[in-house]
């Protein structure tokens, strides 16, 4: 019996919705990245995008353990001397809670073109409203 290799055009993609209310950020991001990569499927192939679409709702209700709410910083650099910008997690959650979840999930995907392609299938929303009802997403529960 030969090894199975998935074909990119033969992959059937489903839509899953994850409710982030009360979930730790890391556990939510790990599970979302797992679905985006397709590791939950028996047809997983590392060099092919076999993953499904993920909708994360209630991003503003995600939690961090310990003192990370005050100590965790998001950093970016403009490339110029002295161009380091730091944003505390608490401020980011007040202004753009979707960005914190997207950043965590993106860090758990491959850092190449395939990872960028997987990242496009992630949709994050601040509250429980999302415009993807037509795709009939299944609810994915995280213990």
UniProtKB/Swiss-Prot annotation:
Q: Does the keyword Lyase apply?
A: no
Annotated InterPro entries = Ribosomal_uL13, Ribosomal_uL13_bac-type, Ribosomal_uL13_CS, Ribosomal_uL13_sf
A single GO cellular-component term from the record reads: cytosolic large ribosomal subunit
Q: Which GO molecular function annotations are given, in alphabetical order? A: mRNA binding; structural constituent of ribosome
- Which CDD domains does the record associate with it? Ribosomal_L13 (cd00392)
Keyword check for Ribosomal protein: yes
* Any Pfam family: Ribosomal_L13
* Function as written in the Swiss-Prot or TrEMBL entry: This protein is one of the early assembly proteins of the 50S ribosomal subunit, although it is not seen to bind rRNA by itself. It is important during the early stages of 50S assembly.
- Name listed for the protein in its UniProt record: Large ribosomal subunit protein uL13
